[in-house]
Curated annotation (Swiss-Prot):
The reaction(s) this protein catalyses: 1D-myo-inositol 2-amino-2-deoxy-alpha-D-glucopyranoside + L-cysteine + ATP = 1D-myo-inositol 2-(L-cysteinylamino)-2-deoxy-alpha-D-glucopyranoside + AMP + diphosphate + H(+)
Biological processes annotated in GO: cysteinyl-tRNA aminoacylation; mycothiol biosynthetic process
Keyword Transport assigned: no
Protein name stated in the entry: L-cysteine:1D-myo-inositol 2-amino-2-deoxy-alpha-D-glucopyranoside ligase
Binding site for Zn(2+): 43, 228, 253
Any one annotated GO CC term: cytosol
Family label: Belongs to the class-I aminoacyl-tRNA synthetase family. MshC subfamily.
Species name: Streptomyces bingchenggensis (strain BCW-1)
């Protein structure tokens, strides 16, 4: 599977600061020191109802991670998956009278277009779950053969008790895990499971559903968590720098994935930091495909909204914050974009070296984009009220906003 084209990242003078970011597993800040090549895995979409504002907010957060790393003169090895086979996708295809493969391809194409418009830097590897199946099957077989997985009516389950550190990512107690498992794709009430929390590794073929050759597992398709594990291990290996996604992925998805990988390899951690973006609401409820309360990037673009304004609307909220999308949020972003563009269109202005430092400092501090935006606002206000004589300032501001915030002025 291919990703989307990369937008150019302008060069900036000097070097950015190392990123200090909130780690879900420890519950506190962690200063990342990735070495010359930073490694990040971000869980991708299930390709139906793409791209809603919750998606966009999540990928915006991890785009900032990439930009901060690039500003420290590091290379970034970014991997993202596409969950192009899953129960919700199949259910939507049936409900729409659509072919599931056509639905997945159409929505993935739309997602790429939205990411391009929003100037999200693409992953180096963009991998669909279906194309990863040949690498998934041997991992499930290894877990089964090691006694870390078991069969139940043809399905293969992972035993969470095989990982002594299970629970270390989310920090939840067993009852909270059970409730979230039921809400988020698990089957804690299925009779015969060794532990209600045990997740599916391999779903045996069902009549009328797609299936693939699973070797000694029989025909079927993979469970959700093992898909990301297989892709991450193949392209990044153990101990990569950041595992990212929305906060609703901390459990069960990232918890289970960490256990799968750690039992498979005998090493830990799977990722050095688990980083989660907040949820975006509409009319007081979390934006979700199941509820249908969605605002789509593509719909806003069709209505003539500048993608740069959409991105500024996302940046106005700290990535870990839960917030609500409103018309007012978008209007404020559009007005900010107009002020910034007017400010950088002038031939000179107030010196901007300090502004570049402020943006870098804000983003290095747990991706504090709102503080970065406030710094640019102050420069733009000074430009509007007093002006300046630094001929290089408008260009530096424009390049800094593009390189570090992903907004083209």
């Amino acid at each position: 599977m291919y990703a989307w084209p990369a937008s150019e990242v302008p060069a900036l003078p000097g070097r950015g600061r190392d990123l200090r970011i909130h780690d879900t597993a420890t519950g506190g800040p962690l200063t990342l020191d990735p070495g010359p090549v930073a490694r990040i895995y971000v869980c991708g979409i299930t390709p139906y109802d793409a791209t809603h504002m919750g998606h966009a907010a999540t990928y915006n957060a991890f785009d900032l991670v990439q930009r901060v790393w690039l500003d420290t003169k590091r290379q970034v090895h970014y991997v993202q998956n596409v969950t192009d086979i899953d129960d919700p996708l199949l259910e939507r295809a049936v409900a729409n009278g659509d072919d599931w493969t056509a639905l997945a391809e159409r929505e993935t194409t739309l997602f790429r277009e939205d990411m391009t418009a929003l100037r999200m830097l693409p992953p180096r590897h963009y991998i669909g779950a279906v194309e990863a199946i040949p690498g998934i099957v041997p991992l499930v077989e290894r877990l089964r053969d090691a006694g870390a997985a078991y069969e139940l009516e043809g399905d293969i389950y992972f035993s969470v008790e095989s990982d002594p550190s299970f629970g270390g990512v989310s920090g939840l107690d067993a009852e909270a895990m059970r409730l979230l498992s039921a809400e988020r794709g698990g089957d804690p009430d299925r009779p015969g499971k060794k532990n209600p929390l045990d997740p599916m590794l391999w779903l045996a073929a069902r009549p009328g559903e797609p299936s693939w050759d699973g070797g000694s597992l029989g025909r079927g398709r993979p469970g959700w968590h093992i898909e990301c594990v297989a892709i991450a291990l193949d392209h990044l290996g153990m101990g990569f720098d950041v595992q990212g996604g929305g906060s609703d992925l901390a459990f069960p998805h990232h918890e289970m994935g960490a256990s799968h990988a750690q039992v498979l390899t005998g090493e830990r951690p799977f990722a050095k930091a688990y980083v989660h973006a907040g949820m975006v609401a509409l009319d007081g409820e979390k934006m979700s495909k199941s509820k249908g309360n969605l605002v789509f990037v593509s719909a806003l673009r069709r209505d003539g909204v500048d993608p740069a304004a959409i991105r500024l609307a996302l940046l106005a909220h700290h990535y870990r914050e839960d917030w609500e999308w409103t018309d007012g949020v978008l209007q404020e972003a559009q007005e900010r974009l107009a002020r910034w563009r007017a400010a950088v269109s002038r031939p000179d202005g107030p010196p901007a070296d300090a502004l570049l430092d402020e943006i870098r400092t804000a983003l290095a501090n747990d991706l504090d984009a709102p503080s970065a935006l406030a710094a640019v606002d102050r420069w733009a206000s000074a430009q509007a009220s007093e002006g300046g004589t630094d001929e290089g300032a408008p260009g530096l501001v424009s390049r800094a906003v593009d390189a570090l915030l992903g907004v083209a002025l």
